[in-house]
Amino acid sequence: MSIFTKIAEKYDLKIISEPVCLSGGLMHKMYKINTQQGTFALKLLNPFVVQRENAMDNYAKAERIELLLEQKGIPILPSLSLGGRKMQEIDGEYFYLFDYFPGKALKSNEITSDHCKEMGKVLAEIHSIDKKYENEAFYEMSVDWNFYLAEMKHTNTKLYAMLKDALPVIQDSQNKGNQARKKLPPIVSICHNDMDCKNVLWNGSDYRIIDLECLSYNNPFMELFELALCWSGYEDCKIDFQLFQAFLQGYKNAGGEMPIDWETLYDCNNGRLEWLEYNIKRVLGIDCGNDEKEIGIEQVKETIQHIIYYAKMKNPILEHCIM
């Protein structure tokens, strides 16, 4: 029996057409389900992610923050509570159900200054909900890149060559990031942690923020810097500084507290390294499903390009930061 049939039976839903796979999920699988009771989005959670240590605790914390954002009127697409729970489980498969929102993620060539100002504004609103002046839990990044390089040599020669060429930049980014994290101002607030273009669905000027499982308390300055880059073309290795500054201005105009030391934020912004490691593991078949190798290969290529581009763009980025 398929998971769709099991869900329909458990929640008394009558499915009226074949569920449609939705694009965009790089970690989990998303489907649109038409039923007589309405249209829903289903997020099937990656079993290897769910099995990680602390995963269930992190999901539970994110759900509590999601409720808080709902109460504050932030335009999110919250998961549905069924039987008093948000996360659902049938026969060991974990998932979330959502009301379907008829919107789409913007492509980079569709993003305007107005979109960036709006995203800066809503980010400032999220950060203002519960701000605490304390140090965030800091874990030093200690990825053994030489181990992965040696493993990749036997698995994929093309990726091995790319990784080898980029290794000095990757190791420099890891070391500088670890040093910079110690210099961050002691402040944490609610952060989405992945509010880039793929996780905001637009219908005209109306929008919903999705992918809320990563909600947690983190340094708001880091999230501001990272998202201003993501919304201004960093994903395509083509930053438009007009969009970059529009995002920062939107945040500032909405009362968001602005950073002073942008260079520290630049060095701290090395989360791409963790995404690179995750996808290298997919290519090597470590802690993942057999169907994840191809997406891993593409993501490793893309992420290495991002890391190299970011290193090249340091001076122009810092020149366009506003106080």
PLM region descriptions:
Residues E277-M323:
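ATP/Mg2+ or Mg2+-diphosphate-binding catalytic cores
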Residues F221-G255, N270-C288:
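Active-site activation/catalytic loop segments of kinase-like enzymes and analogous catalytic loops
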Residues N109-K164, V188:
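A cross-family kinase active-site recognition segment
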